[in-house]
Amino acid sequence: MFIIIKHGDNQEFLVNSNCSVLLLLHYIRKKMKLRKTDTIDLCDESGTMKLLFLSKTPGDSASKFLTARNTYYVCKVERGAPGTRIENSYKAIVPMLKNPEPELVDSLRTQCDFLERSRIKMLRTLEAKRLAAMESSVNLPARSPKGGGAQQTTSTSSQLKSKGGRSDEDGPPSTRRPFYKTRADFLKRHR
C-alpha cells in the first residue's frame, strides 16, 4: 500500500499509506522539512484535494482516502494571520512544486474558494441559530391566568394548603426519610 509523493523540482518519495492520517501528514512534514504548524494536504494529479487536514478522525487509516500506487502532490494550505479576525479563512492552496501545471493551480484555487464559501456559510448559519436562541430566551411570553386575571376567587386557606393536604398553619411538614437505608436498618426493625 505505497503511494508516490511528488514535490519541489520533480523530487519524489514513497510513503506507506497503511498508517493513520495524522502519522502520514507528520511524516510528510518531516521529510520535506516543514514546520509542525504548517497545514498541508495531498492532491492527485488532476488537482483533486484529499482534505486530510480536515479529517474529523485523524486516527483513521490513510489508505481509506488514498489509492495505492497513485501519485500525489503535497499542497500547503495558507490560512489567515493568527490572532486576527480572518484567522481561520482559506487564503490559498499552493502546490509544493517548482513549476506546477496551470490546470493544477486553477483546480486548487477553485477548491480553495469553495472551502472559504462553505466556511462563511457555516459561520452565518451558526450565527443565525445563536441569534434565534437568544431571541427566543429573551422574548418568552409571560403566563397569565386562564380566567384573565379578573376572577380569582380562591380562598387564602386553600392557597396555604400544600400538596400533602396540610396547611402551613399546622407547622412545618415532617421530614420524610426512606424506610430503610441499608440492610442493617431493615434487620433492626424486623427483629
Swiss-Prot record:
Residues 137-191 are annotated as: Disordered. GO terms for biological process: gene expression; transcription by RNA polymerase II. InterPro entries: CXorf65-like. One of its GO terms (molecular function) is RNA polymerase II cis-regulatory region sequence-specific DNA binding. It holds the Pfam family Il2rg. Residues 182-191 have a biased composition (Basic and acidic residues). Residues 151-162 have a biased composition (Low complexity). This is Uncharacterized protein CXorf65 homolog. It comes from Mus musculus. The gene is Gm614.
